[in-house]
Amino acid sequence: MSGNTGERPFADIITSIRYWVIHSITIPSLFIAGWLFVSTGLAYDVFGSPRPNEYFTESRQEIPLITGRFNSLEQVDEFTRSF
């Protein structure tokens, strides 16, 4: 026996005017907010990732590659000291 859950069918939702009035504002707003978050550099600050011009410095031009399995912590410390 299947019962009625009381939910609106999806087809009714996406064909309603109310759905498109709400989403015609929220979807572009989310896109613009994401674009501003990345373009202003706030994403780099929030997540702590280096900016594109900070990957290589004057003193360190090689790739910071971890090569040892057992001394990886020392290598990470060495790389972070050069920043």
UniProtKB/Swiss-Prot annotation:
Give me the residues that bind heme, please: H23
Q: How is the cofactor bound?
A: With its partner (PsbF) binds heme. PSII binds additional chlorophylls, carotenoids and specific lipids.
Gene Ontology biological-process annotations: photosynthetic electron transport chain
Q: A Pfam family this protein belongs to? A: Cytochrom_B559a
Could you tell me which InterPro entries the record lists for this protein? PSII_cyt_b559_asu, PSII_cyt_b559_asu_sf, PSII_cyt_b559_CS, PSII_cyt_b559_N, PSII_cytb559_asu_lum
Q: Which family does it belong to?
A: Belongs to the PsbE/PsbF family.
Q: What is this protein called?
A: Cytochrome b559 subunit alpha
Q: Which gene encodes it?
A: psbE
